[in-house]
């Protein structure tokens, strides 16, 4: 039996799940995204994600259990896509299915993503969803691949 992957609006209780997922050392190593303390995390989510009407964010559930989130936001004149999944949901095709569902809701094109170069699983996920490599960007000492999804 395959996993049932669905998207739904974020509920307040999901934030605790997302916070715990961000604290996973392997996830932060792969993403090169440092974990935030609880107060900074919750403030970011309540003001910059849930509090911003231009942000589209969905909780990803697997068989009814929150597995992570997919989000899109504006950075200047570019719309970006990002996601975060708990480790138990890695390597099962869940991310690809979730992003595919999300892309049916997020209609802005071009749409950009910039995973850390060393996060090969994330790069492959985006390429499976139709993103193509457009260059590299640097955040401090970390090289990221800029990918774009065209119309």
Task: Describe each PLM feature range.
Residues 26-46:
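Conserved GNAT-fold acetyl-CoA-binding loop/helix
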Residues 48-53:
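Short loop/turn motifs at secondary-structure junctions and domain boundaries
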Residues 1-26, 30, 57-151:
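Acyl-donor (CoA/ACP) binding surface of acyl/acetyltransferases
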């Amino acid at each position: 039996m395959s996993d049932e992957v669905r998207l739904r609006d974020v509920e307040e209780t999901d934030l605790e799940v997302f916070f715990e997922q961000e604290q996973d050392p392997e996830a932060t190593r792969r993403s090169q995204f440092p974990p935030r303390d609880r107060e900074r995390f919750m403030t970011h989510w309540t003001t910059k994600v849930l509090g911003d009407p231009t942000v589209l964010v969905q909780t990803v559930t697997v068989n009814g259990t929150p597995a992570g989130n997919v989000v899109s936001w504006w950075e200047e004149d570019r719309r970006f896509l990002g996601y975060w999944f708990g480790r138990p949901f890695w390597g099962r095709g869940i991310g690809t299915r979730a992003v595919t569902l999300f892309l049916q809701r997020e209609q802005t094109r071009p749409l950009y993503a910039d995973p850390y170069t060393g996060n090969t699983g994330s790069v492959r996920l985006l390429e499976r969803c139709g993103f193509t490599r457009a260059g590299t960007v640097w955040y401090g000492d970390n090289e990221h691949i800029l990918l774009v999804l065209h119309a």
